[in-house]
Amino acid sequence: GPGILTRTLLNAGVRVVAVESNLAFLPSLQSLENSLDGQLKVIYGDFFRLDPLVTGKVKPPALCSDELFETMGVAALPWREDVPVKVFGILPQRKERNTLWRLLFALYECSSIYKYGRVELNVFISEKEYKVLTAKPGEVRAYQALSVLWQVGCEIQLLHMEPWSSFITNLKNGALAIPKSVCLPNDHLCLVRLTPRQNLFTGGLKPTNSSTFVFMVKQCFAKPTSRLADRLNSWSLGNGGKLLSEQEIPESAETRNLYPEDYRRLFEALQKSNMFTGTWFHDEVLESIRNIN
């Protein structure tokens, strides 16, 4: 909409492409577009419904990233180059976790918006999801697969925290749109910057095998109190203890004890191991991606 965020960006002098899914906001946005000399471009669509897994033509408000970036005039850059475009938005609360997973799969596969390089996301997310994204081992309720994968993939920076009381969050039926969180604090909306790491695809991690890394981490956190050695043995035919020893990780370590960088090192070691039976992941990885989409 033509609110504070849009006007703040325009007042800063940057070129803005507003992707708006609410038809009620389009007239005022288009009026603002017409009053500016090319600084604002308005597109009807939903940024968080980019590249749905459908056959045939994509129907608005869903969008195709190729068409969006062509309209914006943004060309793809090599991964290690500078950020090609900065995205500002608010994650839909009802689908917040699902949206974070979709973006994560796209990041690791260099698909959708990440085909164009290290696209920077500046997004408002709930405080409880921010706590998950930045959690470390020892934070039992917050530390999850999502924590590991976002921290490996991106630099995460908290830019601002705003109390929910600053926003109108009631649904049409009068209920609160923001449910109370039992396990984690959720009193604020957090503006978070997610910048893909330049060195993400160095070493053994590549877009072609990254979906296996994602699924490996998800499998480890399916039972966070299980011994990592037991998990590894099921993938490397009894070679788990040796791999852990090489990485200086105690054989008694639970899957929730490892830091994000430990998971990356472990995956790269598994890739080098001729005992790794990661091929059995393939069908389950594809099914997981379909479910997320």
Question: Each predicted region: which residue ranges?
Answer:
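Peripheral terminal appendages
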Residues: 2-5, 236-293
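Alpha-helix boundary/capping residues
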Residues: 33, 137-140, 220, 235, ...
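Alpha-helical recognition domains of nuclear gene-regulatory proteins
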Residues: 102, 132, 231, 243, ...
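Catalytic cores of RNA-modifying enzymes
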Residues: 1-215, 278-279, 288, 292
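An accessory alpha-helical subdomain
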Residues: 187-190, 194-198, 203-261
